[in-house]
């Protein structure tokens, strides 16, 4: 985590240095925004988590004996922030002087984790889940197909702030039946971002901070998992049955090269 923090700090420092190093009066690439259509690519760092909702009733050992130790109640406490990165393609269509529409398909690589706690009614204490893993991870390899509107302010020498608003659909190729939580493949999402175009003689660099919120409940219930011949032992079902809803959440620091 410390190495990641240092990496992010270094990248932010580099961007700030590039902004400061821009000539005070000379305007680089003055006709960059006059193109009707242009292309580029993006590289990003992702901070991944879930919106977690527990099951309506506290989960105990049910009549099928599928939920762990008898007399124990399981809680899905929190979603830990996971790390990832992304690569993407940019197609930008200029509509007006200040408004563009952008098609930015991309692929993300990362993991999300959930922390579980158990309450033993016999011992009357809260403790970590008595299992092999009380922080199971869910691999995430989504391919995004988003569409954005980008509104830009007036250009000031070699800087031009902007905001983006849009959404799209995501198909998760990391969905694996070998995980104790089976995530649904498709999700719809809303995304908002803020950034700044930095103009250089031959290209634009646009650092952008984005927030994404998934709409769908991506949790696959155990009943559906069984239909898909879920290979996990029944003792691990409590990971899913302690939950009622999971939604994808993500904050990204993206560097757009155009």
Describe each model-derived feature in a short phrase.
Residues 1-31, 255-258:
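Bacterial Sec-dependent N-terminal signal peptides
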Residues 53-78, 111-138, 174-183, 219-243:
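Flexible, solvent-exposed loop segments that connect beta-strands
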Residues 35-37, 81-85, 139-143, 159, ...:
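Residues that define the transmembrane beta-barrel architecture of outer-membrane proteins
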Residues 26-84, 250, 256-258:
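Short glycine/proline- and aromatic-enriched beta-strand/turn motifs that initiate or cap beta-hairpins
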Residues 171-176, 184-188, 196-197:
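Conserved binding-pocket/active-site segment within a compact domain
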Residues 185-187, 201-258:
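Predominantly the C-terminal beta-signal and adjacent terminal strand-loop region
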Residues 27-38, 45-49, 90-175, 254, ...:
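Gram-negative (and chloroplast) outer-membrane scaffold detector with strong preference
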């Amino acid at each position: 985590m410390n190495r990641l923090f240092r990496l992010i700090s270094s990248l932010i420092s580099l961007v700030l240095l590039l902004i400061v190093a821009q000539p005070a009066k000379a305007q680089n690439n003055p006709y960059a925004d006059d193109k009707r259509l242009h292309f580029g690519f993006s590289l990003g760092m992702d901070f991944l988590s879930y919106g977690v909702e527990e099951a309506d009733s506290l989960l105990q050992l049910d009549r099928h004996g599928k939920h762990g130790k008898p007399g124990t109640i399981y809680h899905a406490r929190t979603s830990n922030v996971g790390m990832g990165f992304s690569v993407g393609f940019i197609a930008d269509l200029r509509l007006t002087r200040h408004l563009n529409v952008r098609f930015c398909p991309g692929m993300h690589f990362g993991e999300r984790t959930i922390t579980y706690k158990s309450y033993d009614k016999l011992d009357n204490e809260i403790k970590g889940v008595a299992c092999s893993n009380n922080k199971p991870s869910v691999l995430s390899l989504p391919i995004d197909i988003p569409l954005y509107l980008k509104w830009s302010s007036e250009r000031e020498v070699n800087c031009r702030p902007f905001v983006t608003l849009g959404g799209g659909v995501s198909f998760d190729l990391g969905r694996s039946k070998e995980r104790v939580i089976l995530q649904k493949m498709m999700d719809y999402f809303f995304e908002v971002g803020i950034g700044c175009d930095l103009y250089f003689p031959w290209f634009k660099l646009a650092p952008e901070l984005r927030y994404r919120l998934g709409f769908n409940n991506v949790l696959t219930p155990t009943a559906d998992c069984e239909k898909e011949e879920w290979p996990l032992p029944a003792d691990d079902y409590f990971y899913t049955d302690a939950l009622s809803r999971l939604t994808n959440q993500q904050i990204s620091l993206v560097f757009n090269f155009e």
